């Protein structure tokens, strides 16, 4: 199936690999600066997610928030983040990723300030919804711009740094939040964990305006100016010229609404705890997905540019890589959720001890990400298979440690060693799969493709957390004492292994179809 980008624009690469040029300006831009600006907001968003668990008790106390309020503090951000990814990715591809990145970061920063100033739980949740939209706006632009301005091994290294930032941010978030709350006290502390994003966000916007090439935006502006000049020349000569046509921007509003509603219907039942009519939304979501696919096909057949060109899925590397990511997130994101429940409720560990037990995992994950990034272009899919095997081994050995804790009373700190195996696998898989899944996607669709993949990950996270914690509490409820928590831990980790085995099958199939890496060096696009 032929794949034709709707819009094309060029960027040229100078002899210095760090420098790039774009049409419409004599300025030279540095990739290293672009990457710094792209990754800092990613860290901000992940710290906002990982630190909120530590802040919840103080939020509950100072705002007199109900359990439902607290649930939406957690889920509201994730929900609006998830439904924003694909529309924002498409808008960035069409209108320009640089400006959309800045706009999303500004929305995120202002919403963070509003969270910190919220006088009650209701306004806090509204601000969290907006914060999620902002993060969902700039996240796909990050992947799209890495896809646009880096190629081959350098792109793999950029995505490896992306993985390092992810691992570091997830680990630092709870520790940073705990330190801030302890330093400033309950009333000011949790608010400061939100407000701290505001100055960093404004700095990021300022640096983006200075350091981003804005290649697409310059190309669109140049085309408008050329059209106006040609129209003015024709008018000046006295010739009869047609009215200057308005620039046509096709964002496929119907397709956008259908997909947003479909993702909302799929994620909401799992985030709200299900029950009653909530599960009927899943059926509605299935119908909406079918309607969306039919609409996108019809829209393209009419010669229009659909929000997601379904030809994206004709790239085996993209469709298989997205399947690996979605099924991996289905299981892996619950690893530390279950650990926290088991340690604090079953073993009586403190929140600080629970946070610290994950630090070795984050450290080795960061190193594994950088190691994999240097080898992705030659051995990427073997790395993915090996990484999944390590995570499965780490999960299985964690169950063995839990059994030893129950039977012989060994220290729960032994879990940090088995979770390090999981960290090695998580870091290696993230760097390699991120690069290879987008390798064949045209750069003009980098944001859309990144948004689709991230949406699959968000859905996997929502479904997996609900399913696996349900298994955990289901087994805890039929027993008594510490043994019941151990049984729940083992059952939940067994469910995680099943999800990871599905991801492993998808990864093996991906290597069989696509080989171990790109068939040839990636061409300059």
Region spans (language model):
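Transmembrane-helix signature of multi-pass solute transporters
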Residues: 107-117, 134, 200-207, 287-291, ...
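Structural signature of transmembrane alpha-helices in multi-pass secondary transporters
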Residues: 45, 74-77, 81, 132, ...
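Hydrophobic transmembrane-helix bundles of small-molecule transporters
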Residues: 182-183, 187-323, 331
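12-transmembrane solute porter fold
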Residues: 31-54, 303-515
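A residue-level signal for alpha-helical anchor/packing sites in multi-pass solute transporters
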Residues: 58, 145, 149, 179, ...
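Transmembrane-helix bundle of Major Facilitator Superfamily
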Residues: 2-210, 470, 474, 497
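Transmembrane-helix exit segments and adjacent C-terminal regions of multi-pass membrane proteins
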Residues: 2-34, 194, 207-213, 248, ...
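Interfacial loop-to-helix junctions that mark the boundaries of transmembrane helices
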Residues: 69, 122-126, 187-196, 249, ...
């Amino acid at each position: 199936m032929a794949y034709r980008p709707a819009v094309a624009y060029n960027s040229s690469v100078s002899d210095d690999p760090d420098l790039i040029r774009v049409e419409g300006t004599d300025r030279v831009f540095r990739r290293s600066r672009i990457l710094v600006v792209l990754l800092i907001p990613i860290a901000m968003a992940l710290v906002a997610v990982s630190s909120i668990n530590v802040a919840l008790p103080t939020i509950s106390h100072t705002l007199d928030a109900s359990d439902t309020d607290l649930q939406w503090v957690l889920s509201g951000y994730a929900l609006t983040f998830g439904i924003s990814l694909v529309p924002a990715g498409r808008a960035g591809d069409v209108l320009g990723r640089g400006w959309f990145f800045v706009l999303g970061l500004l929305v995120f920063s202002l919403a963070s300030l509003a969270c910190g100033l919220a006088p009650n739980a209701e306004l806090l949740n509204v601000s969290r919804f907006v914060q999620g939209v902002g993060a969902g706006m700039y996240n796909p632009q990050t992947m799209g711009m890495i896809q646009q301005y880096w190629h081959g091994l350098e792109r793999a290294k950029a995505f490896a740094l992306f993985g390092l930032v992810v691992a570091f941010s997830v680990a630092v978030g709870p520790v940073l939040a705990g330190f801030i709350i302890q330093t400033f006290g309950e009333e000011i502390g949790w608010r400061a964990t939100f407000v701290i994003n505001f100055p960093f966000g404004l700095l990021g916007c300022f640096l983006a305006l200075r350091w981003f090439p804005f290649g697409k935006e310059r190309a669109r502006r140049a085309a408008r100016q050329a059209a106006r000049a040609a129209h003015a020349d024709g008018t000046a000569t006295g010739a009869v010229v047609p009215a200057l046509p308005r620039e046509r921007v096709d964002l496929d509003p119907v397709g956008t609404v259908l997909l947003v509603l479909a993702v909302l219907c799929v994620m909401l039942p799992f985030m709200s705890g299900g029950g009653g009519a909530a599960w009927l939304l899943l059926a509605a979501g299935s119908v909406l997905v079918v309607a969306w696919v039919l609409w996108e096909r019809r829209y393209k057949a009419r010669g229009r540019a659909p929000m997601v060109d379904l030809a994206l899925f004709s790239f085996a590397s993209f469709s298989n890589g997205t399947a690996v990511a979605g099924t991996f997130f289905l299981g892996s994101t619950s690893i530390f959720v279950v650990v926290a429940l088991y340690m604090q409720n079953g073993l009586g560990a403190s929140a600080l001890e629970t946070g610290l037990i994950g630090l070795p995992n984050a450290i080795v994950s960061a190193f594994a990400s950088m190691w994999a990034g240097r080898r992705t272009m030659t051995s990427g899919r073997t790395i993915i298979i090996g990484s999944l095997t390590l995570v499965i081994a780490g999960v299985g050995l964690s169950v063995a440690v839990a059994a030893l804790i129950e039977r012989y009373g060994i220290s729960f700190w032994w879990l940090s060693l088995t979770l390090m195996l999981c960290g090695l696998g998580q870091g290696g898989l993230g760097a390699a799969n991120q690069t290879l899944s987008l390798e064949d996607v045209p750069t003009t669709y980098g944001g859309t493709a990144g948004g689709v993949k991230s949406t699959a990950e968000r859905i996997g996270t929502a479904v997996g957390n609900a399913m696996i914690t349900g298994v955990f509490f289901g087994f805890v409820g039929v027993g008594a004492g510490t043994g019941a928590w151990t049984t729940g831990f083992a059952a939940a980790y067994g469910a995680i292994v099943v999800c990871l085995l599905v991801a492993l099958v998808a990864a093996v199939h991906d290597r069989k179809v696509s080989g171990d890496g790109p068939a040839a060096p990636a061409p300059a696009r």
